[in-house]
Amino acid sequence: MLESISPTSMTTADLLRGLVSIPSPSGAEAPAVEWLCRQMAALGYQAEPDGAGNAVGTRGEGPREIMLLGHIDTVPGEVPVQVVDGVLYGRGAVDAKGPLATFVVAGARAKLPPGVRLTVVGAVEEEVMSSRGARHLIATREAPDAVVIGEPSGWDGVVLGYRGSVALEYRVTVPMSHSAGPEATAAELAADFWYRLRTWCAEWSVGIDHAFHRVEPKLNALNSSSDGLYGEAVARIGLRLPPALSPEEAIAVATSLASEGGGTATVN
């Protein structure tokens, strides 16, 4: 385990390199959370993990709250931690331990007005659909007066909003048939569903130039299998949704399109 960094000499780069050096894939964030809480405490925060395992640090007292909300988990995969030509490489350096480290150091240096408290959160399980850390915050805390979300947008960019997302699982099972016969295989039915869904997304988005306002599908996985009697295909699909399209409407469309080929589409 890495040792704490001296608060008198801590920079954002120091904190970021230390944080990136601790693997924290979704569901296994505890070592990084504990280390970050120690660093925040050294910088003057009251810091500890909350009930979901989020790293939470607070400065100041008062009825008004500013929350700087980042996430501490990363997608899987190891990227060697190194600095090359002044650029830090490592899993999560950009998404999103960089913004989180910036929040921690900037928050420690900020001069807070009377009656204002500052809370920095490194949420867990943001990179998976559970969103455990964020859901815990919603369920257990009152809404802050202001929230800044730490996600990569370029050092000089401010993002004003994010599209919604829906993760779908398509599944279809059919009796096995001879390969020379006319019956569609499960894999073919899954491919047909993907084509229908992608076509619907494109038609919905006709005339819309900006990606933020379009429906954008992504086929993340497509697998087929057979036990000799039945063939099965499973597809995992993500939909990015604009403000004008509700998740309920998108799910209803996907369910209808899936049923056309005898399959099902459920929220994953």
PLM region spans:
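Predominant activation on well-ordered alpha-helical scaffold segments within soluble catalytic domains
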Residues: 13, 17, 37, 101-104, ...
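Flexible, glycine/proline-enriched loop segments at strand-loop-helix junctions
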Residues: 90-93, 123-127, 175-184
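Metal-dependent amide/peptide-bond hydrolase catalytic core
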Residues: 28, 48, 166-268
